[in-house]
């Protein structure tokens, strides 16, 4: 069993890896945090307290997990790599408020796990250094399930984080921005250098905060259909929405006039590009489309 010193230092991380003969798997995007200051910034941004339940994805050797355990009521961590379970049993042995589930977060029954382990928590936050290769599927999977999550403070590839937080009209703004901002209010916490990881990743990192909205930003009757319609506007970013929707709809080329009429009734200039349309603009398009049964996809 380890003593109560912080895990997130180069020397202690290396000692743990040597003790267990652990080798990093590139395919799992394993990069462990070795800077306690960064972890403290993440904890501070999370606003967790003794009544908070935390979901962590990819705890690794427990560098962030131990700090979460010191601040939160309970921590529920999902770790896909079986080789790390003995390490976590060691590093987290001082804490009786942590449950580690050895399962792929994209295949796990998260709702059931939350009901079993975090049911007595007043607030639930997702706090994690996410595996960069599956950041987007993880976030969308959590947001689109009926799980009572209040917010997320998550580390990810800088480029992806900038897309989540992008403003209308910016180069980074796209369909991912729309989905995430539909569900949450987004903000940047801090940029993280490569040097605070072992091994250093190939990309720069960012921590973002996403707080769940009490109500989605706009009201639509079918979220999946709404997101598909919005995504189609970005199919070819250099093309106008008129061109993109002609390619998106079945027989769109034969319905050019109908598409123009639809855009006009929604108050959207057909010469605009997808990146200039707000979520509210896409909601107008979605509602107006119901008046044009010819526009199928």
Swiss-Prot record:
NCBIfam families with a match to the protein in the record? ksgA
Protein name stated in the entry? Ribosomal RNA small subunit methyltransferase A
Q: What Enzyme Commission number(s) apply to this enzyme?
A: 2.1.1.182
Coiled-coil regions, chain positions: none
- Write out the GO cellular component annotations: cytosol
Organism expressing this protein natively: Staphylococcus aureus (strain Newman)
Q: Any idea which positions bind S-adenosyl-L-methionine?
A: 31, 33, 58, 79, 104, 129
Q: Which reaction does it catalyse?
A: adenosine(1518)/adenosine(1519) in 16S rRNA + 4 S-adenosyl-L-methionine = N(6)-dimethyladenosine(1518)/N(6)-dimethyladenosine(1519) in 16S rRNA + 4 S-adenosyl-L-homocysteine + 4 H(+)
Q: Which UniProt keywords apply?
A: Cytoplasm, Methyltransferase, RNA-binding, rRNA processing, S-adenosyl-L-methionine, Transferase
| Family under the similarity heading | Belongs to the class I-like SAM-binding methyltransferase superfamily. rRNA adenine N(6)-methyltransferase family. RsmA subfamily.
Its localization reads: Cytoplasm
> What main location does UniProt list?
cytoplasm
Which function does this protein serve?
Answer: Specifically dimethylates two adjacent adenosines (A1518 and A1519) in the loop of a conserved hairpin near the 3'-end of 16S rRNA in the 30S particle. May play a critical role in biogenesis of 30S subunits.
Molecular functions (GO terms): 16S rRNA (adenine(1518)-N(6)/adenine(1519)-N(6))-dimethyltransferase activity; RNA binding
């Amino acid at each position: 069993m380890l003593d109560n010193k912080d895990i997130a230092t180069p020397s202690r991380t290396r000692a743990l890896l040597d003790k267990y003969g652990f080798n990093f798997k590139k395919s799992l995007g394993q990069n462990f945090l070795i800077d306690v200051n960064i972890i403290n910034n993440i904890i501070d941004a999370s606003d967790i307290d003794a009544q908070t339940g935390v979901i962590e994805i990819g705890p690794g050797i427990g560098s962030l997990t131990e700090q979460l355990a010191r601040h939160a009521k309970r921590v529920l961590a999902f770790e896909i790599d079986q080789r790390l379970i003995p390490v976590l049993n060691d590093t987290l042995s001082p804490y009786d408020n942590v449950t580690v589930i050895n399962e792929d977060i994209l295949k796990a029954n998260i709702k059931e796990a939350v009901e079993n382990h975090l049911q007595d928590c007043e607030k639930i936050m997702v706090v994690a250094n996410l595996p960069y290769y599956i950041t987007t599927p993880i976030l969308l999977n959590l947001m689109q399930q009926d799980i009572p999550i209040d917010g997320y403070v998550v580390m990810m590839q800088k480029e992806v984080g900038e897309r989540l937080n992008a403003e209308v009209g910016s180069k980074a703004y796209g369909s991912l921005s729309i989905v995430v901002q539909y569900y949450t209010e987004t903000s940047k916490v801090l940029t993280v250098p490569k040097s605070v990881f072992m091994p250093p990743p190939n990309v720069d990192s960012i921590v973002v905060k996403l707080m769940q909205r009490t109500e989605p930003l706009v009201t639509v009757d079918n979220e999946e259909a709404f997101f598909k319609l919005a995504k189609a506007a970005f199919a070819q970013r250099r093309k106008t929405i008129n061109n993109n929707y002609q390619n998106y709809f079945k027989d769109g080329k034969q319905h050019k006039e109908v598409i123009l009429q639809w855009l006009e009734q929604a108050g959207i200039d057909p010469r605009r590009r997808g990146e200039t349309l707000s979520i509210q603009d896409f909601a107008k398009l979605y509602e107006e489309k119901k008046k044009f049964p010819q526009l199928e996809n």
